[in-house]
């Protein structure tokens, strides 16, 4: 597996600093971060690259020790969130008077700063307004708040000898954007940042559905550069050359594997080739992102993970639907406890329509009906339930579409270690669609119903043409149901995050270049394959209960 350089951090904090815990938990999600939490500053700081202090009173001796640590090349992040926090003169700031707690618009002073790469132009944080008034000429404002038509510094850095210091009065430690900014600040203080580093990317398989999407996503993501595109088809190579004239166009996987300008390869070929091509590219020392599903069997994913470990390269799955607006809204609602503990879930995709004539409908290539959309839907299920899947039951029907090898309908039932249940159904013989989402929690429910939208184009002769937008690409109507203490069920529309393009590619670059966590970790993509394989085995045996390994 691809290993990031260790980042050794010492955090000095008191026992009553529970507000800081979400940020510390975030740091713990990254294996390369070695975090040590202590109540007071030890005499020996040599094992650490960065020290975090949390507004606790530092003695004059502590100030001296921190100054020696920083001037020798260390980093110091001072979190000045306590009302009575005092700033050491070494920080180069004086803390202004506290203002009201309100939503602040926080902006990077320089949006080309390494800490700002691939982050939004502005983040909104509920925080007391407490400015940092600079008293040192070399103090640099990294973040400021819009305050009464002024730029009010909220995160400031300065050099001290061979090291660096940063301080901030921002304290919304459960805000994911602030967590990412503070982590990047720690990297910056340690002397590491992605700066202008680039990963050359090759696309293996210029599929009509995803080839151009990946090319555009790479081009829109700082830190990634499209270097080459490879496909066996002359027609697809010609299309790739037209779409991306600056990319090298290759016709063999061997040529792509040997290309010295390619660091990362995105494999966008049919599922029955995923394992073989991933192994070939990783054996050549390339990082790999594979289209979903990661593979068809657990034996294949085991071999792929072993190769990634052996060659110390990155391996992950293109789980781009983790960034769909409806999934993100549901995940946010669960994180906020809006329906209590999730214990039951159903998902559905399909309709009553002749299956396509592509490989998606041919089981020896696709893996079967559940492997196609199930690669996304079961990934959602795995990510929303904290416990591991224990048992799987698969059932299928073959009644109408005898010209294709896929089943007409497949259902996958999953039971988790905590007793929770989930179901995924893909049906091409459903004259009436079930809801896309049906979630039950201990305090409420979420229902997501499919939408149907037509787009009209004017025609001077025929008046207009209408086109369907595929239901799978439309955000469903999401409704939250909660039981009021009076016994009534109250319903409301679920809040939706804004739609943003190419978030998968941005997250991939964040992981490769800074070590930030993947939204869809490899181990979860491996679990998806294990569930799909167990469901296929169960369906083949008439719906047997398949027990998954721990």
What do the predicted segments below correspond to?
Residues 198, 320, 443-519, 523, ...:
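C-terminal glycine/acidic-rich active-site capping loop/insertion
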Residues 28-45:
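A short, well-structured beta->alpha microelement
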Residues 4-6, 26, 30, 133-194:
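A glycine-centered loop/beta-turn motif at secondary-structure junctions
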Residues 1-30, 194-244:
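N-terminal Rossmann-like dinucleotide-binding module
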